[in-house]
């Protein structure tokens, strides 16, 4: 074997070692997140996929502003899939119909009873459908208006008057509603608020910078409340 061929082999070996090292580092780094969150994919014809840039922007804001370590890539999760138990926070949004079948009702209820948290964001038009479906899960519970001193409004950011108003639709006030099971807030529902629209890229809805920041700060509070697990 010539010296030249030996040098070539050594060069290729160094390249392979370098690439393997990079692969191992990348694999380790990609798994070095504290949390991953999910977007709930439901049946019924409603646009569960509305606001496609919202969660990514919220994650970026939270990691930057409140020191979370959330994986920047969120997952789309079907209601009846047991993988839902891997996510401390699940987001549900849309404008239209939502339908949960018996298996999905059971799975989502078990998820919430096991410590999971569901955040519903009314993207205008969702309300009559989601209320009916949540009654399948907790027939004994009604959504209640959370008081302004609830911890969800007072994490890093204080919202002394409750939810900010991001979009105006029916001249109704924005409401922060909750389902409380055995003393724990298992579901937060922002109604007539459009938080998710406020999380979207600035050029999507042309919201003011002030409105977008308020929406992101409230979203950060919701995630902080979810992760810290404060009692009501």
Regions found by a protein language model. Name each.
Residues 33-35, 85-90, 113-117, 141, ...:
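Loop/turn elements at helix/coil->beta-strand transitions in domains of secreted/extracellular proteins
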Residues 69-77, 120-123, 141-147, 232:
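Surface-exposed patches in mature extracellular/periplasmic domains of secreted proteins
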Residues 30-89, 93-96, 194-195, 199-232:
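Aromatic-Pro/Gly-enriched surface loop or interdomain linker
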Residues 37, 89-128:
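Short alpha-beta junction capping motif
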Residues 16-26:
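Bacterial N-terminal signal peptides
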Residues 9-16:
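Positively charged n-region of N-terminal signal peptides that target proteins for export
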Residues 35-36, 41-45, 53-54, 127-203, ...:
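An acidic, glycine-rich "communication" segment
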């Amino acid at each position: 074997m010539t010296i030249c061929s030996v040098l070539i082999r050594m060069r290729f070996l160094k390249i392979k070692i370098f690439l393997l090292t990079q692969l191992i580092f990348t694999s380790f780094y990609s798994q070095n997140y504290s949390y991953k969150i999910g977007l709930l994919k439901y049946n019924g014809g409603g646009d569960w996929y509305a606001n496609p840039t919202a969660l990514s922007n919220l994650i970026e804001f939270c990691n930057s502003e409140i020191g979370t370590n959330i994986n920047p890539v969120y997952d789309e999760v079907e209601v009846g899939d047991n993988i839902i138990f891997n996510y401390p926070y699940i987001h549900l949004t849309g404008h239209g119909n939502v339908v949960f079948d018996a298996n999905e009702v059971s799975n989502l209820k078990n998820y919430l009873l096991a410590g999971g948290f569901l955040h519903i964001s009314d993207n205008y038009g969702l309300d009559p459908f989601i209320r009916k479906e949540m009654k399948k899960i907790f027939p004994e519970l009604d959504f209640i208006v959370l008081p302004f001193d609830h911890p969800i409004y007072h994490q890093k950011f204080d919202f002394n008057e409750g939810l900010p108003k991001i979009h105006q639709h029916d001249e109704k006030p924005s409401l922060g509603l909750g389902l409380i099971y055995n003393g724990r807030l298992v579901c937060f529902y922002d109604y007539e608020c459009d938080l998710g629209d406020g999380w979207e890229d600035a050029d999507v809805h042309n919201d003011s910078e002030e409105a977008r920041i308020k929406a992101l700060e409230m979203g950060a509070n919701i995630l902080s409340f979810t992760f810290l697990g404060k009692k009501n």
